[in-house]
Amino acid sequence: MHRPARDTHDTRAVHDTGDTRAAHDYDLLVRDSQLLVIDDATEIPGGWVALRDGRVAAVGGPGTEPAGVARTVSAAGRLVTPGLINTHHHLYQNLTRSFAPAVNGTLFNWLTTLYPLWSALDAEAVHLSTYVGIAELLMGGCTTSMDHLYVHPRPRLVDAEIRTAREVGFRFHATRGSMTRSVEDGGLPPRSVTQTDDEVLADSERVVTTYHDPSPGALIRVALAPCSPFSVTKELMRETAELAERLDVRLHTHLAEDRDEEAFCQETHGCRPVEYFESVGWMTDRTWVAHCIYPNDEERARLAAAGVGVAHCPSSNMLIGGGTAAIGEMRALGMPVGIGCDGSASTDHASLWMETRGALLLARYRGGPAAMAARDALDMATRGSARCLGRDDELGHLRPGACGDLVVWNTHEVALAGSFTDPVEAWLRCGPSRAWTTIVAGRVLVDRGEPQLPALEEKLREHARVARRIQRLT
């Protein structure tokens, strides 16, 4: 049995949160693991985890399992980890996956091809894309995801995705995205998917005051997220930062993703993207950004000093040929670095397992085999992502008191045959690409590899109908 040198856990002990009820009064027990990963420093061979009221109440080693639980899930010798956390996504884009006219373009070509299609988005389309996207995320072991919805051809689309996440019981960080610079204003999108600064600010405050839940263990939170430096006005960037400060919510945007963005900022604002980002008040520890491929060494140091987090999106950047983020250097500077799927029309999937594996491969391609191990990649997809969302106290680990979000991975698959010496390395090198059990807030949402969503088949049929309409195929 694999026992990492850093495992100092007393496998005989049961660590409880101190609840006054009986120690065996638990809602759910996951037992008989091959290896239980608590966090980046603690692993328990054969470990178990008990949940109560949607949180981790106790963990322990073989032979110390509590009795009297309401439901028991046998891991049956499988790997158990904290749930993976997605720090950058565009769920609505699964309605235009692998759209042939866009797949071989640059970032700006890709966007200008798809913007006219996305102008057909409505509440039904957002609901269906969110439902199907969450199902896919759950199957890939994701228990928390943000979503960056920045196309608003119709009002209250963010409301539709929040209602859908609540319906499923998924932990969801909605972001009120925005675009205000249409092609007529020197931007890229058509007027049909943009709004005025005043419209964006008013609705941003409405969404936060209506839906944002700052309480511990919250399933729904809201952040503010102008799309990018080239898609909104300077005034909106600055006023959004001020609004986030007043409402005490987080900030998100795309930053330094593409050389075209760099040229745009130089031509429009007379400075590089990071300098512009700092000038509008975004250089703060309430901010995390997507991609961050092209900052230079001095800019990375300034971002790190400010506590800005980064959502690393390896697949979309590789598919579009957009470059590779210097993740090793960022982590060495202490920056919060998490994993993001990015859009389902750029990455063309919503598997955080695949993105975590992609991060491992890219890091080793850039820096050699010592640059990253599977545990480092897992730490990025859990604790690192939780830091980006400002929730590393309760997400990204399985210490008692944490939110009850965890995944059982099937290490008995054909793809893992012969892998005996290190289950974490085998998990990311060999497979599995699909979760066996996914638990969110103590609720089993994937069981034996199947999403526990009775409406999924019907939603898939409806999704296909709407996707064909949006792609103008009917």
Annotated model-derived regions:
Residues 279-286, 328-413, 430:
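His/Asp/Glu-enriched, well-ordered alpha-helical/loop segment
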Residues 33, 49, 54, 77, ...:
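Divalent metal-coordination and catalytic microenvironments
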Residues 156-292:
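Metal-coordinating catalytic core of metallo-dependent amide/deamination hydrolases
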Residues 169, 241-250, 282-285, 302-311, ...:
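Glycine-enriched alpha-helix->loop->beta-strand junction motifs that scaffold or abut catalytic
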Residues 1-47, 52, 382-474:
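Active-site microenvironment of metallo-dependent hydrolases
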Residues 95-126, 181-197, 218, 259-286, ...:
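Active-site gating loops and adjacent loop-to-helix segments of metal-dependent hydrolytic enzymes
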Residues 97-171, 201-216, 464-466, 472:
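Alpha-helical scaffold segments that flank or form the walls of functional sites
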